């Protein structure tokens, strides 16, 4: 998920077939805000970058945060959270948008260094 604002909780683990958290295998959040709780459920690998979260909960094998306000403290390997205060270098993918005249345009983000929310 990129560039979203979730007002409330965000639960990222499916519930299915009476199997509690279900099965899920990882994901990514960037340039986003979650006002309340993020629960990754059974996610096994996860990367969150340059975002703001209320409270982070769960994660199974390897959860990485860079430049994330509200991230859990560095604690690898137990629990398996790797937390870095800034994102050293990143570049977002280009994306389409509609300008003020209704025309489609392509925005190409610039290189970002040492970003932090």
Predicted features by range, described:
Residues 1-117:
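Sequence-level preference for short, compositionally simple segments enriched
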């Amino acid at each position: 998920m990129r560039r979203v604002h979730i007002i409330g909780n965000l639960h990222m683990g499916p519930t299915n077939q009476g199997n509690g958290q279900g099965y899920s295998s990882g994901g990514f959040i960037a340039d986003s805000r979650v006002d309340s709780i993020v629960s990754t459920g059974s996610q096994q690998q996860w990367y969150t970058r340059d975002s703001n979260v209320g409270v982070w909960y769960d994660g199974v094998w390897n959860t990485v945060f860079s430049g994330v306000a509200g991230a859990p403290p560095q604690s690898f390997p137990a629990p398996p959270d790797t937390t870095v205060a800034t994102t050293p270098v990143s570049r977002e993918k280009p994306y389409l948008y509609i300008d003020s005249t209704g025309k489609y345009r392509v925005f190409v983000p610039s290189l970002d260094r040492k970003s932090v929310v």
